[in-house]
Amino acid sequence: MKHKVTFEQDGFVRVPGFCDAEELQTIETALARFIAERVPALPVEDVFYEDKSDTCSLKQIQRMHEHDDFFAQLIEGKPKQLAEELLSGQVVCKNLQYFNKPPALGQATPPHQDGYYFMLEPCHAVTMWMALDPADEENGCVRYVRGSHTRGLRPHVRTNTLGFSQGINDYGSEYDCENETACPAQPGDLLAHHALTIHRADANQSTTRSRRALGFIFYGESAREDAEAHDIYQKHLAWEMAKVGKI
């Protein structure tokens, strides 16, 4: 319950050592296999590269649990249990993602609220981010605006950031700056935030270190998605990314 109290108060919670060394090694082995064997056959809209001609610039993979039994079991385990605690009830597993900020290539993640992308009523959802590499201020750790989940959805505008197509257009108020909190993480540490919590991350300034992570998204059972609007948005986004050679 301690995680739930912090989550409801701050809009996010840090869970150090969510996965231990043995669990991480199992995940790393499965991830390497997935990238080698599954990624080449995935739909183009599920795989993003900083530079499509360079496979080493892999930035995001979407819906991994729909393409592989290991990751389907992973999202149904400890992450789902935590989501049910944080949202006080049954949840729906929506996405298991891979994120990377490659050395010197990884762009900044614009300030945003996941709820803007989710298109839910009510906006009852949680996103989790589990570090696979050490994440710090040099390579772009996640930054949250404490308490922002209580202040509603902010206006968003189109961005040019791959994988984060919308960002808050008026970010930087006194409230934002005073309440922004950097959240460094070690491999296996997990961060969970409410769908209305504002968060961002700086670019990867390191020339040698990646900043890899897995993401888990869960909707509360009461949340209803505007499926038609979401589908139109996703199709248009895929068209735009294909046009500029990102997928």
Where do the protein language model's features map onto the residues?
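Short beta-strand His + acidic residue motifs that chelate non-heme Fe in jelly-roll/DSBH
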Residues: 128, 193, 199-207
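Short, structured patches in soluble enzyme cores that scaffold and shape functional sites
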Residues: 97, 113, 130-134, 146
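A short hydrophobic beta-strand segment most commonly corresponding to one strand
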Residues: 128-130, 209-223
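Double-stranded beta-helix
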Residues: 135-200, 223-224, 239-243
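Non-heme Fe(II)-dependent double-stranded beta-helix
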Residues: 2-10, 16-111, 117-120, 157, ...
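Short conserved catalytic/interaction loops centered on acidic-Pro-aromatic/His motifs
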Residues: 142, 202-211, 225-230
